[in-house]
């Protein structure tokens, strides 16, 4: 499943395609959304917001389309008039004069009014987004030490969207390797230096992935600005200590770590 950085890049692509352009056609597959089709013609998308793995597409008439791709949903950008050859089921079409965005296969789609943005069950439950530029390491540290989270093992905590939105398995693996901790650690047991390092890594690694993953710098090892240090690298040598990277299962998800320097 895509994690926060991939969801944010998808949102960027949608914004680049249709933000600020009048909608010339709108179509929804679900009957409960049909009434909004005519209300959105002539309106425009003001911005696309991410809340973890959910997208909020905000329109100029104050309506907001909530969508969560879950495992199978996918957005595509096409030239208006183009019909992609796909076996996926179309759920949403937002068309402008030159570009159209299409949502396929997703089932968790709703239209929200402004007052519903604070009462929607998922949006109420989800924690602050790691890609929100206003989120600071100090706030993350406070959340780590809060009664709700301080006694939780990182194996599960770093996958819990109520703690921080946008984290997922590859980020969990890379963050814990970066700070030399295991999935069995808890915030309440860390010293001040460990806590500070973790609070910074929880923001820096997702943001670095969002900003640079897929970009190439020939001066970097293997050319990649963001690359996995341990994820999917079981059996290889740890670049920090030379130990052998191992694979196990934590919180029902594959977990990669180095026993030599994560303890």
UniProtKB/Swiss-Prot annotation:
GO biological process, one term: base-excision repair
SMART domains: Fapy_DNA_glyco, H2TH
Keyword annotations from UniProtKB, A to Z: DNA damage, DNA repair, DNA-binding, Glycosidase, Hydrolase, Lyase, Metal-binding, Multifunctional enzyme, Zinc, Zinc-finger
Gene field: nei
InterPro entries: DNA_glyclase/AP_lyase_DNA-bd, DNA_glyclase_Znf_dom_DNA_BS, EcNei-like_N, Endonuclease-VIII, FPG_cat, MutM-like_N-ter, Ribosomal_uS13-like_H2TH, Znf_DNA_glyclase/AP_lyase
EC number: 3.2.2.-, 4.2.99.18
Residues spanning the signal sequence: none
PROSITE patterns: FPG_CAT (PS51068), ZF_FPG_1 (PS01242), ZF_FPG_2 (PS51066)
Keyword set includes Ligase: no
Keyword Lyase attached: yes
PANTHER family, sorted: ENDONUCLEASE 8
Family classification: Belongs to the FPG family.
Upper classification of the organism: Bacteria, Pseudomonadati, Pseudomonadota, Gammaproteobacteria, Enterobacterales
Protein residues bound to DNA: 70, 125, 169
Reaction(s) this enzyme catalyzes, per UniProt: 2'-deoxyribonucleotide-(2'-deoxyribose 5'-phosphate)-2'-deoxyribonucleotide-DNA = a 3'-end 2'-deoxyribonucleotide-(2,3-dehydro-2,3-deoxyribose 5'-phosphate)-DNA + a 5'-end 5'-phospho-2'-deoxyribonucleoside-DNA + H(+)
Cofactor: Zn(2+)
Function: Involved in base excision repair of DNA damaged by oxidation or by mutagenic agents. Acts as a DNA glycosylase that recognizes and removes damaged bases. Has a preference for oxidized pyrimidines, such as thymine glycol, 5,6-dihydrouracil and 5,6-dihydrothymine. Has AP (apurinic/apyrimidinic) lyase activity and introduces nicks in the DNA strand. Cleaves the DNA backbone by beta-delta elimination to generate a single-strand break at the site of the removed base with both 3'- and 5'-phosphates.
Record's protein name: Endonuclease 8
NCBIfam families reported for this sequence: PRK10445.1
Cofactor note: Binds 1 zinc ion per subunit.
Zinc finger (FPG-type): 229-263
Annotated Gene3D superfamilies: 1.10.8.50, MutM-like, N-terminal
């Amino acid at each position: 499943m895509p994690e926060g950085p991939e969801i944010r890049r998808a949102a960027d692509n949608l914004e680049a395609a249709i933000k600020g352009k009048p909608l010339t056609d709108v179509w929804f597959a679900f009957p409960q959304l049909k009434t909004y089709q005519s209300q959105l013609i002539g309106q425009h998308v003001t911005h696309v917001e991410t809340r973890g793995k959910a997208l909020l597409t905000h329109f100029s008439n104050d309506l907001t389309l909530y969508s969560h791709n879950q495992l199978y949903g996918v957005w595509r950008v096409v030239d208006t008039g183009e019909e992609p050859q796909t076996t996926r089921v179309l759920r949403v079409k937002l068309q402008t004069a030159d570009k159209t965005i299409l949502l396929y296969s997703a089932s968790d789609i709703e239209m929200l009014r402004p007052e519903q943005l604070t009462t929607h069950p998922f949006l109420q439950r989800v924690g602050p987004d790691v890609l929100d530029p206003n989120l600071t390491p100090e706030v993350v540290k406070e959340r780590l030490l809060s009664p709700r989270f301080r006694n939780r093992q990182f194996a599960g905590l770093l996958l819990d969207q109520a703690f921080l939105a946008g984290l997922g398995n590859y980020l969990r693996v890379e963050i814990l390797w970066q700070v030399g901790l295991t999935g069995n650690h808890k915030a309440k047991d860390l010293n001040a230096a460990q806590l500070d390092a973790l609070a910074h890594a929880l923001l820096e690694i997702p943001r670095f992935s969002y900003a640079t993953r897929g970009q190439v710098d020939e001066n970097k090892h293997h050319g990649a600005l963001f690359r996995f240090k341990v994820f999917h690298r079981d059996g290889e040598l740890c670049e920090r200590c030379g130990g052998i990277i191992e694979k196990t299962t934590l919180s029902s998800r594959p977990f990669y770590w180095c026993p030599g320097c994560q303890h």
